[in-house]
């Protein structure tokens, strides 16, 4: 309380602006690239009545911010003191170099939205196993990606079926390891009484001839077969008188 002085007094009111809340909502475009957006975060602050607020434009990896900041003129109605920012999702390039291999369609490629789950191609190539030149990301990062298949030729067990023949000279009759796309290398020569060795073949009958220079095209363990040609003998008969 104050005591009235013995003279006229003039009092002046002093007003302080009230503080009212405002909200800034940050929305991000959905990963499917549709026109739907999901709220990433909301920021709640207060400011004086009639203040003009220009909320911060945040930066989010993989998204493009709106071109201009919005303004909020603070009023007593906090429900109206709202600014909504919508961020579009960026696209990045994703490519797969199969390097001579093949893959069934359905894998992720082309221009891909940020954070999209990546489905890698199931790459196949006869006689080879595949790895990629770098680790495959689970989701699309905020950068372009270019993968390349690295193929490794497979090795298989080769069995030699002698068909009654036996080894002469260099070489052994055994099971050996051969590699797809490379030559069979040294193959033994065989002998068989009454026959001439005609080489190794891919089938017991028919098939194709397999030499040391033949490239392996089989895609698994396999057998080659020795083939022989009967020797024809000329028999002359003589009578008792030598005629």
Regions found by a protein language model. Give the residues of each.
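Secondary-structure capping and domain/repeat boundary segments
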Residues: 1-243
